[in-house]
Amino acid sequence: MVKFPFMKIQMMMGMKIKENELFEKLKSFFPDLVQSSQFDSWDCFTAKHNTVIELKCRNVHYDELIIERIKWDALAHKRASEALGTIYVCWTPKGTWAWNLGSINAPEWHIKRLPRTTEHLARDWINKEVGYLHIDQATRVKLPE
């Protein structure tokens, strides 16, 4: 199982990083980390730890961070069908948290109106099924500068 060091929370107030920057910082923990294809349901993979990792960068910090059910289900399927570990890593302005999704229960699901994608300026809003992961269930990750 993948373990991140328990360290002081990293404060990056006023800074926003992108998923590709988060990926590069995580390579200090997983030197063999490789990005997935754009068609995969996760962002990267470490063969040494036999684990797929999903990355999210949020502009605002909440103690409960959102995960879409479609993402949870895809990662759960990957975990069950290929015996892989599944980690969800979320960066916020107040720090970075990692959840080992195989060691926690699925969250309670809710319908929430959200943008179809956050990658484009034109936002098409749709209903999405989402759950919330509390940071108390996660490991705080101290990223390199």
Regions found by a protein language model. Name each.
Residues M1-Q38, S81, T96:
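Acidic-basic catalytic patches of nuclease active cores, encompassing PD-(D/E)XK
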Residues Q35, V52-E54, I87-C90:
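A structural signal for short, well-ordered beta-strand segments and their strand-loop junctions
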Residues C44-H61:
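Conserved catalytic cores of phosphodiester-cleaving nucleases, focusing on short active-site segments
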Residues N59-D73:
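Active-site-adjacent loop/helix micro-motif of nuclease/hydrolase catalytic cores
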Residues R69-A83:
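Basic, amphipathic alpha-helical patches used to engage nucleic acids or provide basic targeting signals
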Residues R79-N105:
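Nucleic-acid nuclease catalytic cores
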Residues W97-E145:
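Intrinsically disordered, low-complexity terminal regions enriched in charged/polar residues
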